[in-house]
Amino acid sequence: MALLEIKNVVKRFGDYTAVNDVSLSVEAGEFFTLPGPSGCGKTTLLRMLAGFEQPDAGQILLDGQDMSQVAPEKRPVHTVFQSYALFPHMTVRENIAFPLKMAKWDKRKIAAQVDELLEDVRLTQFGDRYPHEMSGGQRQRVAIARALVDRPRLLLLDEPLSALDAKLREEMQIELINLQKEVGITFVYVTHDQGEALALSHRIAVMSHGKVEQLDAPEKLYSYPKNRFVADFLGQCNVLEGTVKALHGDAMTVALKGCGDVKCQAVAGVKEGQQGWLALRPEKVKLDKELPELPDEAYFKGRVHDCLYLGDVTLYVVEVADGVLVEAMQPNNIPGVAKFFDDGDVVEIAWRFDAGSFLTE
């Protein structure tokens, strides 16, 4: 049985439906992420899991028990927010111990539990410091330790890293992954950061307009998006309009608008003449001054329209026809492979027939 089950949950604010008939389940010990753009309903859903909002319809089951109308303090659930909400007049140790003191735990048990959490979040030497004496990342770890100290069944995290700088955010992602493995508690994590969702999660439910667009493992979502929204939301993606021209076995020919025919993998239920879009990740596109024309590859000549140097890679935008742009990602640091091109250079691009996904919605 799943630890958490969300069944047909709806939440309205006046005439606005923030969460629209969402159903999903989360397994015990899972790191589950809800990414989506602002206003997609992810935070409202998290607030219902915490008990800060009540659903207008549907059920929220935790260990098989309906929690939809249970008060927040009665749920075995804790929440970590973007703001750390630490008590400034208390030390790190006192902040972490606070929930246990309120629950009237024995002092020796409190001390042992706090010591264990300090070790889990790698802050053993900071127990006697005050919040203002610590970095943002350290304060966030204290907030997480406080939320975990009485071992809740479920930890909710509402964009906890968004206030940190990019480098510290990356470090904290690794800390969170290791911490979740160590404590074994189920995490449900809300973020607008696609990279964060891909890096942290066992599974991801991408949300848009109050609905779950697609739920799967990160690598499946990235490689096999269900629709244009998911393809475009999770990382860089070429989305090229086209029409199915012919079907042949496990492949099909698609006429890309403005630039010619390509082969791609067949999609169940697709018919000749059907319109759609080829979703193609830039790192799957080969780019060079000259490329061999191979039978299982799409091939185009073009001109470099723009280039964006990103350190380890460069993103090239290649115009292959009037107004038709294809992005190609090239590594910069591989000996014998790294090549650089300038705006206006004439180049050739190619990709394997199975490199992209044909989308019908």
Swiss-Prot record:
It holds the Pfam family TOBE_2. Residues 4-234 form the ABC transporter domain. It catalyses: ATP + H2O + polyamine-[polyamine-binding protein]Side 1 = ADP + phosphate + polyamineSide 2 + [polyamine-binding protein]Side 1. SMART domains: AAA (SM00382). Keywords: ATP-binding, Cell inner membrane, Cell membrane, Membrane, Nucleotide-binding, Translocase, Transport. PROSITE patterns: ABC_TRANSPORTER_1 (PS00211), ABC_TRANSPORTER_2 (PS50893), POTA (PS51305). Its EC number is 7.6.2.11. One of its GO terms (cellular component) is ATP-binding cassette (ABC) transporter complex. It is a peripheral membrane protein. It comes from the Bacteria. One of its GO terms (molecular function) is ATP binding. It is found in: Cell inner membrane. ATP binds at G36, P37, S38, G39, C40, G41, K42, T43. InterPro entries: AAA+_ATPase, ABC_SmlMolc_Importer, ABC_transporter-like_ATP-bd, ABC_transporter-like_CS, Mo/tungstate-bd_C_term_dom, P-loop_NTPase, PotA-like, Transp-assoc_OB_typ2. Belongs to the ABC transporter superfamily. Spermidine/putrescine importer (TC 3.A.1.11.1) family. The complex is composed of two ATP-binding proteins (PotA), two transmembrane proteins (PotB and PotC) and a solute-binding protein (PotD). Part of the ABC transporter complex PotABCD involved in spermidine/putrescine import. Responsible for energy coupling to the transport system. This is Spermidine/putrescine import ATP-binding protein PotA. It comes from Chromobacterium violaceum (strain ATCC 12472 / DSM 30191 / JCM 1249 / CCUG 213 / NBRC 12614 / NCIMB 9131 / NCTC 9757 / MK). The gene is potA.
